[in-house]
Regions:
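N-terminal Rossmann-like NAD(P)+-binding domain of SDR-like oxidoreductases, especially those catalyzing
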Residues: 1-190, 232, 307, 319
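C-terminal substrate-binding subdomain of Rossmann-fold SDR/epimerase-dehydratase oxidoreductases
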Residues: 6-7, 13, 24-32, 65-66, ...
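Gly/Ser/Thr-rich beta-alpha loop segments that engage phosphate groups in nucleotides
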Residues: 19-22, 48, 110, 138, ...
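A short beta-to-alpha transition loop/helix N-cap that caps and shapes the active-site region
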Residues: 46-48, 136-137, 194, 260, ...
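Short, surface-exposed alpha-helical segments at coil->helix boundaries
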Residues: 48-51, 168, 204, 261, ...
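Conserved terminal C-lobe alpha helix of the protein kinase catalytic domain
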Residues: 200-204, 235
């Protein structure tokens, strides 16, 4: 399957959470295509620094707003019709699940409904960024899109898991009832420049600890696995879904699976650090293994990640080295 580029010069795109880690890279790619991009962010976890290089760009507008309160229609950039809406706004790290639980639930529910209504009104393509967390602690491996998941609905992670599952259900309801042109992407573990050093996820934590010469804290036995995807590959996958007419959900990530111990040791090696690995108590509801089945992404979108873990981690380490001084 070859997907033809559908959105480019002359198209107006709204990206929610646009100053966040993944969305800011997506904004870069859309600007490079010739799109006019409006990024909306309330900066709860996003950073103006991530889009500072675009502030003077004639086809970029940054609007500070909480999409859970609705889009600020008084803003000229918001009032004009959009050709596509990409909903990526949400705190997404383990530390956020405990510190921002209500915000996560609101942006996954109320904000999603506001944005779906706007997409219907504008006749826009709507892309909803879901997550591998929709599968919970999976009993199926690798995870296919047909798997319904194994989610604890009242656990510490549930605010994120269930918010995304609600967003998926809402998107499909609008697709079926209103005929909305919509697509759902289930994003697997992604890493790269612009991640927050303190966001609680394994890769930024391990890199920060290694660069500081501190012990690498691995939760549990370190045998848990993740498939790690470099952000550029993920962005390519999201753009393929945007350009397509696929509804999904479609997994996006990489099938390269590593244990947490292997990941820690690779980061220690790439940083040249003398850090040791220290095992600490495992967090609640931490999935044992996670790897996407990418058959659907390959067949329907022609998706194929290209950045190896070693190369992607090198680029990420370089970014963190500059950021941490």
């Amino acid at each position: 399957m070859v997907v033809t580029q559908r959105f480019g010069q002359g198209h107006r795109i709204l990206v929610t959470g646009g100053a966040g880690f993944v969305p800011s890279h997506l904004v870069d790619a859309l600007i490079a295509r010739g799109c006019t991009v409006v990024a909306v962010d309330n900066f709860v976890t996003g950073s103006k620094e991530n889009v500072a290089h675009l502030i003077e760009h004639p086809r970029f507008t940054l609007v500070e707003a909480d999409v859970s309160e609705g889009l600020p229609q008084h803003e000229p950039a918001i009032a004009e019709r959009f050709d596509a809406i990409l909903h990526l706004a949400s705190p997404a790290s383990p530390t956020d699940f405990a510190s921002l639980p209500i915000e996560i639930l609101r942006v996954g529910s109320i904000a999603t409904l506001h944005l779906l209504d706007r997409a219907v009104a504008d006749g826009a393509r709507f892309v909803m960024a879901s997550t591998s967390e929709a599968y919970g602690d999976p009993k199926e491996h690798p995870q296919q899109e047909t798997y319904w998941g194994n989610v604890n609905p009242v656990g510490i992670r549930s605010v994120y898991d269930e918010a995304k599952r609600f967003s998926e259900a809402a998107t499909m309801a609008y697709h079926r009832f209103h005929g909305l042109d919509a697509g759902i992407v289930r994003i697997f573990n992604t890493y790269g420049p612009r991640m927050r050093p303190d966001d609680g996820r394994a890769i930024p934590t391990f890199i920060t600890q290694a660069l500081r010469g501190e012990p690498i804290t691995v939760h549990g036995t370190g045998t848990q696995t993740r498939s790690i995807c470099y952000v550029d590959d993920l962005v390519r996958g999201i753009l393929l879904l945007l350009d397509s007419t696929e509804t999904g959900p479609i997994n996006c990530g990489t099938e390269h699976e590593v244990t947490m111990t292997e990941l820690a040791e690779l980061i220690v090696s790439l940083t040249g650090s003398g850090s040791s690995v220290a095992y600490v108590n495992r967090t609640a509801d931490d999935p044992e293994m996670r790897r996407p089945d990418l058959t659907l992404a390959r067949e329907r979108l022609g998706y194929a990640p290209t950045v190896t873990p070693t190369e992607g981690l090198r680029r990420t380490i370089e970014h963190f080295s500059h950021r941490l001084g």
